């Protein structure tokens, strides 16, 4: 395989270019070799294909010659069929690893097994499982106590086993490490399993005379061997077992009470650890991926809230929605606003539509009708904005008409009828109150005309203003209210007759 060497950072430019050039040349050489090999292989394949074609042609010619021959071909069987090869005996040995070796050494050529993993890279001969299982030092020990076992031996190691338990490690390799090798003794706290009991004193035939232990001491020391079938490990292993005792595939032990002493079951371990190249565990599942570990991650069924159906009262209750606040009113010029029509909301749609744009401003009021001059007045002037009560407008109109001498004025009583629309500017309606007052009083000595003329009214108004300023107010009866009210439009005196 071609590997491209990396160029260091501190390499110069020339060195970098040189290394890149060397790498490219090497890549070309490797590519040429690969193409040459592929071409050579293709040539070999073509040669094999041509040989097959030639063999096929020969077979076709033989078939054609057989079809054209007139002879009858018969096949005769021998009197006895050839003997079937004997089936190889069922192997009772452990796993054979070096199966491709030409020579399998015998047991006399192998050194004695001092450790359980001495046979990992050597072939094994047929052995007696019962004998091997009874040997406590046959199987691989846990990694936690392997070093101690090699140094101090089996007796001191057995005392350490019964001295106390250790805390469970965070990441055990497999379930076999949870127990001591060859026994059902848990190696950690809170671990147990469905294993058969096995005496620790197998080397001294289970007797108490050699070990010097009493029955109470042995019972206390073997507390770690007792099975706890209701533990988490055993219940997890059996929770998915769908085969009960009545199932035809269920395993049953034909145990006879009469042959209780002679019957002996072969006990097989569930795992054979430290066998490189083979599975560690064939029956038990890894506790790291067991389903009981997922209970802390997945939500439980009772914690999932269920959707409750609404009651009749809730279903009949009207749905209320919160409307957005109305937009602020727009400031418009003071003008008569049209009356707002009430809107009845019968049902609010589920989707709130955006607020409607504000209504357009009302049209401006129509201009006032054009002023028509009255037939009774011969003086016309354009109205201006009154600032001092109308006196300046009146004096300007008099000056524009050529003075008071040229004004053609007449009394109100001389015209019984007044036709035309009231425009609020006629002199006759403006001097109505002043013309009625001198009827009952004597004419002013300085008046230049009759009691109802314009100049006399002006002179009286000026005298009254002057007296009011000086504080000399004469007690006069108040004028009628009707005299101060201007006539309505289209007024006709005939209606009052």
From Swiss-Prot:
Pfam families for the chain: WASH_WAHD
Gene Ontology CC, one term: WASH complex
Tissue specificity as recorded in UniProt: Expressed in several neurons located throughout the body.
Gene Ontology molecular function, alphabetical: actin binding; alpha-tubulin binding; gamma-tubulin binding
Coiled coil: none
InterPro entries for the chain: WASH1, WASH1_WAHD
Keywords annotated in UniProt: Actin-binding
Start and end residues of each stretch annotated as Disordered: 306-497
UniProt KW tRNA processing keyword: no
Chain ranges of the WH2 domain: 390-412
Compositionally biased residues, Low complexity: 341-350
Gene Ontology biological process terms, A to Z: Arp2/3 complex-mediated actin nucleation; determination of adult lifespan; endocytic recycling; exocytosis; regulation of gene expression; retrograde transport, endosome to Golgi
Mutant lacking the gene: phenotype: RNAi-mediated knockdown positively modulates lifespan; effect abolished in hsf-1 mutant background. Increases resistance to both heat and oxidative stresses. Increases localization to the nucleus and also DNA binding activity of heat-shock transcription factor hsf-1 after heat shock. Increases in transcript levels of heat shock protein genes sim-1, hsp-70, hsp-16.2 and F44E5.5 after heat shock, but not in unstressed conditions. May also moderately decrease levels of post-translationally modified hsf-1 under heat stressed conditions.
Stated family: Belongs to the WASH1 family.
Purpose: Acts as a component of the WASH core complex that functions as a nucleation-promoting factor (NPF) at the surface of endosomes, where it recruits and activates the Arp2/3 complex to induce actin polymerization, playing a key role in the fission of tubules that serve as transport intermediates during endosome sorting. Acts as a component of the DHIC (ddl-1-containing hsf-1 inhibitory complex) which modulates lifespan by sequestering the heat shock transcription factor hsf-1 to negatively regulate its binding to DNA and its transcriptional activity.
Subunit structure: Component of the WASH core complex. Component of the DHIC (ddl-1-containing hsf-1 inhibitory) complex, which contains at least ddl-1, ddl-2, hsb-1 and hsf-1. Within the complex, interacts with ddl-1. Formation of the DHIC may be dependent upon the Insulin/IGF-1-like signaling (IIS) mediated pathway.
The protein, known as: WASH complex subunit homolog 1
Recorded name of the encoding gene: ddl-2
């Amino acid at each position: 395989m071609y590997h491209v060497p990396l160029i260091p950072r501190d390499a110069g430019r020339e060195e970098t270019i040189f290394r890149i050039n060397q790498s490219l040349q090497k890549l070309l050489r490797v590519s040429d070799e690969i193409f040459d090999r592929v071409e050579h292989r293709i040539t070999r394949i073509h040669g094999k294909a041509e040989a097959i074609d030639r063999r096929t042609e020969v077979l076709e010619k033989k078939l054609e010659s057989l079809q054209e021959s007139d002879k009858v071909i018969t096949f005769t069987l021998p009197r006895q069929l050839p003997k079937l090869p004997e089936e190889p005996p069922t192997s009772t040995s452990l796993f054979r690893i070096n199966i491709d070796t030409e020579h399998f050494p015998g047991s006399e050529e192998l050194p004695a097994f001092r450790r359980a993993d001495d046979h990992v890279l050597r072939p094994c001969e047929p052995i007696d499982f019962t004998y091997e299982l009874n040997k406590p030092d046959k199987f691989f020990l846990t990694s936690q106590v392997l070093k101690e076992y090699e140094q101090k031996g089996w007796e001191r190691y057995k005392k350490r086993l019964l001295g106390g338990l250790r805390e469970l490690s965070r990441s055990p390799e497999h379930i076999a490490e949870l127990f001591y090798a060859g026994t059902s003794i848990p190696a950690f706290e809170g671990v147990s399993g469905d294993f058969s009991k096995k005496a620790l004193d197998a080397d001294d035939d289970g007797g108490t005379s050699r070990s010097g232990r009493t029955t109470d001491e042995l019972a206390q020391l073997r507390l770690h061997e007792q099975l706890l079938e209701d533990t988490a490990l055993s219940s997890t292993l059996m929770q998915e077992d769908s085969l009960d005792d009545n199932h035809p595939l269920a395993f049953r032990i034909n145990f006879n009470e009469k042959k209780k002493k002679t019957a002996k079951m072969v006990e097989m371990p569930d795992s054979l650890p430290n066998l490189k190249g083979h599975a560690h565990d064939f029956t038990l599942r890894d506790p790291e991926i067991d389903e009981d570990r997922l209970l802390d991650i997945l939500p439980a069924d009772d914690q999932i809230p269920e959707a409750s159906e609404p009651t009749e009262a809730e279903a009949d209750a009207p749905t209320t929605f919160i409307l957005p606040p109305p937009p602020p009113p727009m400031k418009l010029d003071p003008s008569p606003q049209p009356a707002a029509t009430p809107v009845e909301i019968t049902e609010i749609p589920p989707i709130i539509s955006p607020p409607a744009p504000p209504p357009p401003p009302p049209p401006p009021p129509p201009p006032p009708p054009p002023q028509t001059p009255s037939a009774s007045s011969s003086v016309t002037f354009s109205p201006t904005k009154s600032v001092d009560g109308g006196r300046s407008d009146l004096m300007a109109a008099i000056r524009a008409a050529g003075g008071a001498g040229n004004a053609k004025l007449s009394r109100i009583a001389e015209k019984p009828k007044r036709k035309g629309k009231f425009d609020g500017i006629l002199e006759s309606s403006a001097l109505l109150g002043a013309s009625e007052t001198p009827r009952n009083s004597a004419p002013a000595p300085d008046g230049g005309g009759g009691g109802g003329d314009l100049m006399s009214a002006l002179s009286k108004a000026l005298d009254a203003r002057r007296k009011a300023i000086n504080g000399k107010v004469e007690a006069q009866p108040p004028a009628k209210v009707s005299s101060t009210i201007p006539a309505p439009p289209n007024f006709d005196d005939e209606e009052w007759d």
